[in-house]
Structures are given as C-alpha cells and as structure tokens.
C-alpha cells in the first residue's frame, strides 16, 4: 500500500486528507519512484482552493453523472508536483532507468487535468520522461524542491531573453522560484535588482543581487539602484504596470501570475510553460557544482496534519526558499 495526500472538494488546507491506496503498477514507459522529498508550491493551494472551479461547473453541465451518481464518491485528487526519490519499479520499454536509481522530477500536467496522485505520496507513478538523475552530492531535500523552481526559472529567463549586460528586476526574489531566477540571471552575466522584504536584504546580497524593499516608494528605490532596467521577471504577481513605468519593453516582462495588466502592457505570461524537463537536469547540475543554491526554509513529514501546516506557512507569503515534505 501507499499513503497519498489529496483532496475531494475545494477549500482551505482542511480539505486535504490522507488515504491508503494500492501500490501503483508501472505501464509502458513508466516508473514508480519511492518519494523521499517533495517540494510544495503556491500553485498547489490555488488548485485545491478552487482556481479551476469554473471548469468544474462546465464539466458538471456536460457530465452530471460524474457528480450525482448514487453512492459515487468523488475521486481523490493528487497534490504536489516536485519530487525526489529512489526508483522502486520500472515498466516495459524503460531502458535508461533501473530500480535503485536516485532521481528527481516534476509531475507535469495542465491545471484542469485531474491527477489521482500528486507527488505527496510514498510511491509516485510517472512517465520516465518526467525524471532526471539526481546528482550524488545533492540531498534529497534540495532535489525534491528543485522541479518547479528550476523549470519555471529557466523558462522565464528564456521567455524574456536575459543576456549578459542586462539589468533585471526580479519580484519575489527571495522565494523558491525567485531565488533561482536571481542566481541564474547573474550566472548569465546580468545584474539583478531583487524585490523582497527588508528581512531578506542580506539574503539577496548573498546571492549577488541588489535588494530593494517592496511597498510605497518602490519605483523610486529601483530607479536609484539602476538608471535603466532592461528586463523584469515577476514571481509574485501584480508588477506588470511597474515594469511598464520603468520603461521595460513588454516582450521583456515575464510574470508567473496572470493579471489583466499583462495584456494591457503586452507583457508575457511565462514560467514552466517555457521550460523543459532538461532544464531541471541543468539546474541540478549547477546545484551540484555549487553555482546555484536552493534554500530550504523548512521540512515537514508526510502526515496530513503536518502537510496542512506546511501549506498554511506557504500561504503566509513570507517563505525564504522552499518548503519540502519528507518521507523515509
């Protein structure tokens, strides 16, 4: 049996529940990974919070039997995308992975695609295309938090075409994704101005960025830090208008959070949609050689009450780095 954390209805962290399920069996091109660590991300609580609820209404109209069939219980939906662990089973036509391999990966799916299991499970069934080898020098906790951060950061920088000599503003620079964006941009020869709380100023300096505090007077503080800004990556949301006022061309403004201002200023909605699984391997290699670090804010065990507490902390919005769920 495997333990799975998921939800059957939309709401706050209280909708998360734990269930014992049969061990997944890998099909063609699939593997099962015994999870050792799994990072959590804001998209997770947005999903179980009901961001896709309008789509559910459409489905109900089209297929009412899915919801109202007598005695039928709603399926448990999986939570989580990031993971790292040890391969415990392989399916047919899997030639480059064997049982015992240490891997990390990302469960990739569109938000409207219901997953019976996410990465918050003791055993994860996934396509072999969703995993990459874990470098031996990288801990499971760090590897387990890399998937979304690495793919999103690489995708965002690709989208806005960050190059050597650029001056890049990163909003939410102290977060899990923002910290990786900051380091990758600097590794390309760009200068980074990081927007974060004053408490994270020293942390951003340690990454090589120039910190500026959010709040009233932000635009002026950025102008004082850099006479000209050439690119803007918004990992927090709501900064497209600021980027426009700073004179950044719309095609060089990327945001991870869609808002009406994106269309108004011809900015770009970016992130994982512009990333690939190979980006995760690239960043994992950089973590292994020390050129990129992933800060782990806190770890919680894979127990439903602890997972609820982890998401509650993440929802507070002031996490430095990543929160990771661990299993033995």
What are these regions (language model features)?
Residues 69-81, 96, 103-172:
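NAD(P)H dinucleotide-binding glycine-rich loop of Rossmann-like/cofactor-binding domains
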Residues 43-45:
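Cytochrome P450 core scaffold surrounding the K-helix E-X-X-R motif
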Residues 193, 206-270, 277:
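Glycine-rich cofactor phosphate-binding loops and adjacent beta1-alpha1 units
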Residues 4, 83, 153, 307-310, ...:
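Non-catalytic, hydrophobic alpha-helical segments
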Residues 22-39, 53-107:
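Glycine-rich beta-strand-centered segment in the early N-terminal region that forms part
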Residues 4, 167-168, 253:
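Conserved hydrophobic helix-helix packing surfaces used for dimerization/oligomerization
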Residues 280-328:
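C-terminal hydrophobic helical "lid"/dimerization subdomain
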Residues 144-214:
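Mid-domain Rossmann-like dinucleotide-binding core that forms the NAD(H)/NADP(H) cofactor-binding site
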């Amino acid at each position: 049996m495997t333990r799975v954390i998921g939800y059957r209805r939309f709401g706050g962290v209280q909708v998360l529940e734990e269930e014992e399920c049969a061990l997944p069996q890998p099909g063609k091109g699939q593997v099962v990974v015994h999870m050792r660590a799994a990072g959590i991300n804001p998209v997770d609580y947005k999903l179980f919070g009901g961001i896709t609820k309008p789509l559910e209404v459409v489905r109900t109209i089209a297929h009412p039997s899915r919801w109202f069939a007598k005695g039928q219980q709603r399926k448990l939906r999986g939570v989580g995308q990031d993971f790292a662990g040890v391969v415990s089973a392989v399916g047919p036509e899997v030639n480059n992975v064997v049982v015992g391999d240490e891997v990390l990966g990302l469960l990739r799916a569109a938000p409207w695609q219901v997953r019976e299991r996410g990465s918050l499970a003791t055993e994860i069934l996934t396509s072999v295309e969703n995993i990459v080898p874990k470098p031996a020098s990288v801990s499971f906790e760090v590897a387990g938090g890399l998937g979304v951060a690495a793919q999103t950061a690489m995708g965002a920088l690709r989208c806005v075409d960050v190059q050597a000599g650029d001056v890049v503003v990163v909003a939410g620079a102290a977060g899990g994704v923002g910290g990786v964006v900051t380091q990758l941009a600097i590794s390309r020869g760009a200068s980074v101005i990081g927007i974060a709380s004053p408490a994270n100023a020293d942390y951003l300096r340690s990454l090589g960025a120039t910190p500026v505090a959010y709040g009233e007077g932000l635009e002026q503080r950025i102008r004082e830090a850099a006479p000209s800004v050439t690119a803007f990556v918004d990992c927090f949301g709501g900064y497209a208008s600021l980027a426009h006022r700073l004179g950044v061309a719309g095609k060089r403004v990327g945001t991870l959070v869609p808002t009406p201002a994106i269309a108004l200023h011809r900015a770009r909605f970016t992130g994982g949609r512009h990333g690939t699984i190979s980006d995760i391997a690239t960043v994992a290699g950089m973590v292994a050689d020390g050129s990129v670090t992933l800060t782990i804010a806190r770890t919680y065990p894979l127990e439903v009450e602890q997972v609820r507490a982890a998401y509650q902390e993440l929802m507070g919005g002031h996490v430095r780095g990543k929160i990771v769920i661990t299993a033995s």
